[in-house]
Regions:
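Active-site phosphate/ATP/adenylate-binding loop shared across adenylate-forming ligases
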Residues: 1-16, 67-238, 246, 250-261, ...
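Conserved AMP-binding/adenylate-forming
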Residues: 221-316
Length: 434
């Protein structure tokens, strides 16, 4: 793989600023954000008043812990435009979550917010090894989902040539990669695996493509999956993080020269880690739930937003800004089985340690009697059908030994485990509703 480390002169000055400079900027921007939200968003005014705090109570960054959290339910209760802090006619675009479990969460952007968004995505692509003039194959979905357009405008701002393929039509994805010879692909990691499988089905060696780096996000993925994709594609696999409620993709990104966690662009987003039970902040280095406060958003400032993602805050390495560890799971996709907490990402790690099994899987929760049961659907790799049963038994023992729970491992025929051109549905809950 090529050395894609950016030249120090290409970085924004804030990326290498001192901690004191960065904290002073954060305090200034945080003070503005709290005042802006309090004055212009009735929800925040009511929430601050109920908590007995006002914007002027923020004297240090630690004082942010006195302010109330914002949850996805707050956004849904103020659907569609109740969280906007600017007049609606200043908003030039909206995005929204899928709304599969209720009303969608709507996010609005005036032109200045779109420019900030493009800036942090461009910074993320550059951190991943991208350069002006690179061809970028964008296989994130376009539409209300923030992935496609967020990646698109960030890549254009960096100076890339963007191929706006969107998701789906896997054969066409492979054809365009062959024809246009892109340097970069942006896509969900699970769909990248489907693209690799299609290349191999067509007799194309994935290692022979022009791709130098894949920027993968929108769902948790492990370092074992990184090794899998880098080995099969001979390219760098780099993580990008974001969520629509905060801005979209580009909140944090791995740096290609280290790949040791995702640098949070702290000049625009202030991170905290809190204990998901007590909701109290925990020191850097301890695992907990990731919480974000926006620092520069005008249309929809977000205050202490609970992401439900589990991670740790770590010191900066390639940049002076702090890093978050790869997301280990979500508080809302945690499976509790026989008193043991586990996450789909833990299952993924063990599948990737089982050579005869493909990296496609799905966890299915059922309750056949009085107790919950977890079934892990897996597939054999090409050429490993005859050894799949033994591999499944090995996986079952690995899960029992490493995680401490007994599961059923069900081997399906190649191609039977559900695929997705977007976020993979790793957990299906088929238990009866109470």
């Amino acid at each position: 793989m090529q050395d894609l480390s950016p030249h120090p002169g290409d970085l924004d000055p804030i990326e290498t600023a001192s901690t004191d400079e960065l904290r002073a900027l954060q305090l200034e921007r945080l003070s503005w954000t709290l005042e802006h939200a309090y004055r212009n968003v009735p929800h925040y005014r009511a929430a601050f008043d109920a908590a007995g705090v006002r914007p002027e109570d923020l004297e240090t960054l630690d004082d942010l812990a006195r302010f109330p959290f914002t949850a996805k339910s707050d956004l849904r209760e103020n659907y569609p435009f109740g969280m906007f802090a600017v007049p609606r006619d200043q908003v030039v675009r909206v995005h929204a979550s899928s709304g599969t479990t209720g009303r969608p969460t709507v996010v609005g952007y005036p032109r200045d917010d779109l420019d900030v968004w493009a800036t942090v995505v461009a910074r993320s692509i550059r951190a991943a090894g991208g350069r002006a003039g690179d061809i970028l194959h964008n296989a994130y979905g376009y539409g209300l989902f923030t992935g496609g357009l967020g990646a698109h405008y960030g890549a254009e701002k960096l100076g890339c040539l963007v191929v706006p393929v969107s998701g789906g039509q896997t054969e066409r994805q492979v054809q365009l990669i062959q024809d246009f010879q892109p340097d970069i692909i942006m896509v969900t990691p699970s769909y990248m695996l489907s693209i690799i499988d299609e290349m191999e089905r067509q007799g194309i060696d994935p290692r022979s493509t022009s791709l130098k780096v894949g920027i993968f996000g929108a769902e948790p993925w492990t370092n074992d999956m990184r090794r899998e994709m880098e080995a099969r594609l001979d390219m760098h696999a780099v993580d990008i993080y974001g969520l629509s409620e905060v801005i979209g993709p580009g909140v944090a990104s791995e740096c290609v020269e280290t790949k040791d966690g995702l640098t949070v662009w702290e000049d625009h987003f202030y991170p905290e880690i809190v204990d998901p039970v007590t909701m109290q902040p925990v020191p850097d280095g301890e695992e907990g739930e990731l919480v974000f406060t926006s620092l520069t958003k005008q249309a929809m400032p977000i205050i202490r937003y609970r992401t439900r993602d589990l991670t740790r805050l770590l010191p900066g390495t390639a940049r002076s800004m702090r890093r978050i560890e790869k997301i280990t799971g979500r508080t809302d996709d945690m499976i509790i089985l026989r008193g043991v907490n586990l996450f789909p990402t833990q299952i993924e790690e063990l599948i990737l340690q089982t050579p005869a099994l493909a990296p496609h899987f799905q966890c299915v929760l059922t309750r056949p009697g009085q107790l919950d049961e977890l079934t892990v659907l897996v597939e054999p790799r090409e050429g490993a059908v005859d050894t799949a049963s033994d591999a499944a038994e090995r996986l079952r023992h690995l899960i029992k030994d490493r995680i401490g729970v007994t599961v059923v491992v069900d081997v399906r025929a190649p191609g039977e485990v559900e695929r997705s051109a977007g976020k993979a549905r790793r957990l299906v809950d088929e238990r009866p509703k109470r």
